């Protein structure tokens, strides 16, 4: 019965707590423990002021941007920075390129301009951030090996989900 249900799956979307951030290499291998959404990273106040507008979701020590600065400090500027839902999407795809807009607000993504803040675009680690896609966008087809491992059709589409709070409203 479960295999029959799995064979009917056509698309998957992940929702997750938007602030949890992890560092991984280009193959998606985590470099260490994720920094949870509730963890504040102290000592980055001046950098945050230079990178993002004050009062925005990325401007505090408890935002993902502060966690990104901490992870970059520990693991270096060549590590990928991914929120948990974006990392899981990468695991399904075998490709850690993509990020979903809502999950990246606290990292500095601007929903109105559909871009990173200008000061952030000048950082040497900008290319370590995900390419952002809107919620509901198709990111790609599940990796063949992952489909086999999970007993899913090999044409399942992986779709950008949303944050846990947005999903709760839906």
Language model region names:
Residues 1-32, 77-79, 126, 147-160:
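N-terminal glycine/serine-rich phosphate-binding loop of ATP-dependent small-molecule kinases
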Residues 35-53:
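Short alpha-helix plus adjacent loop in nuclease-associated cores
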Residues 53-165:
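Gly/Ser/Thr-rich active-site cleft segment
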């Amino acid at each position: 019965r479960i295999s029959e249900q799995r064979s009917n799956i056509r698309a998957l979307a992940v929702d997750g707590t938007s602030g949890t951030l992890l560092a991984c290499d280009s193959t998606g291998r985590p470099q260490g423990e994720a920094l949870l959404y509730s963890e504040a990273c102290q000592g980055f106040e001046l950098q945050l002021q230079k990178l993002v507008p004050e009062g925005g979701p990325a401007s505090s020590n408890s935002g993902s941007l502060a966690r990104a600065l901490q992870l970059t400090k520990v693991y270096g500027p060549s590590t990928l920075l991914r929120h948990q839902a974006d990392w899981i999407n990468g695991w399904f795809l075998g490709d850690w390129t993509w990020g979903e807009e809502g999950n990246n607000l606290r990292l500095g993504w601007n929903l109105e301009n559909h871009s990173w803040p200008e000061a952030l675009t000048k950082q040497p680690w900008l290319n370590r951030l995900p390419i952002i896609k809107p919620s509901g966008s198709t990111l790609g087809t599940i990796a063949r090996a992952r489909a086999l491992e999970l007993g899913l059709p090999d044409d399942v589409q992986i779709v950008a989900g949303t944050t846990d709070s947005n999903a709760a409203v839906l």
